[in-house]
Amino acid sequence: MLPPEARALAKPYFEVLIVDNVNEHQERWLRSNVTRMRRSEDPFVYEALVVPSLEDALVAVLFNHNIQAIVVRPGLVLKSRMDQEIVARFLTRAGGQEEIDNMLPENYGPELCRLVAKVRPELDAYLVTERSVEEIAGLDLGICRRVFYNQEDFMELHLNILRGVQARNKTPFFTALTEYSKQPTGVFHAMPISRGKSISRSHWIQDMGAFYGPNIFLAETSATSGGLDSLLEPHGPIKEAQELASRAFGSKQTFFATNGTSTCNKSVVQALVRPGDIVLVDRDCHKSHHYGMVLAGAQVCYLDSYPLNEYSMYGAVPLREIKHQLLKLKAEGKLDRVRLLLLTNCTFDGLVYNVERVLEECLAIKPDLIFLWDEAWFAFARFNPTYRKRPAIAAAGNPKHTLPSDTPPRL
């Protein structure tokens, strides 16, 4: 393996999945044509993987995270040559197994694009088809970025693949910061640091400069010196970075903060809770939430998690306990004062809630209940097909299947 310094300078590597039922000779032809398109000026390097069926393609995107694009060709078949139990479970859970089994072969490609969108929505798909434009135009193609009609234009496909990956690889704020660090800027708001000059000229702390390197000081910036953007009123690279973060995490909007998770938690609690509101809170939640409740003037009803004695740790708050407290407050005539339910998903020990079920059963008791899910330990879930449906943001984005009201839950 290359050392970190060499890897940082090397071109990023990814893999492209080609789905087509071809023989060994045709597979070599596909791979060689893809390899032949490489150019020295390309920002990335990729290799092609070829699988014959829809089921094989689903297994590949579920378990191979090097795959960043998928090319669906008209020759794909439905079933794998191997028994893929995990795919059968996925299709059953997605509610489409019987429908797919009865599907015409010409619809396998569009259906694969739709299924991949459920497990790896960040991928780009490219559909190669022999069907007419009129037939394709009205179909739901999921993550399909472009359709190629009756052609083998590998260069055009190659350029589209690179363009799609480049769009997801953009780092607007980091790029702006690196450009800013190269400018001959004078700093007057923090004189002791002065872009590292006081360190490089010191007789005593040269080791500090050697440890951190010059870039961390050259990238010194603040709202007073300008040159980048404003966290309070973003309009440039920070705004663009926040928009890309929203797309990555599936949120409506994203805000960056430099105060850490604790201050963010207190800010959210104070924005949602009014003095005198009753709030149901996981007793084991992060301490910043407790501070936020004090600052907001909330009346807290603590919820206890269940013990896991065999592992010497605690689990999550049982749904039965949450419903018991809501019904108890309802019997006391205080349900109208209940404002918010605060839970940690996943817990500090890795236990995950069934968020959709919690939403469904709590909203049946109090339809205007606000849910605050602390998922600081679960940010990775969006990027893993196994956990993708477990974060609160996924449940909020798909309420129509399980929730008793047409109004999406407030999260």
Residue ranges: model-predicted function:
Residues 1-5, 25-26:
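Extended low-complexity, intrinsically disordered and solenoidal helical-scaffold regions
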Residues 15-21, 28-64, 72-75, 79-122, ...:
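Conserved PLP-enzyme active-site core in the AAT-like
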Residues 168, 172, 232, 236, ...:
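Conserved active-site and cofactor/substrate-binding residues in soluble primary-metabolism enzymes
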Residues 10, 22, 240-242:
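Beta-sandwich/jelly-roll carbohydrate-recognition scaffolds of carbohydrate-active enzymes
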Residues 133-212, 217, 223:
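Terpene synthase/cyclase
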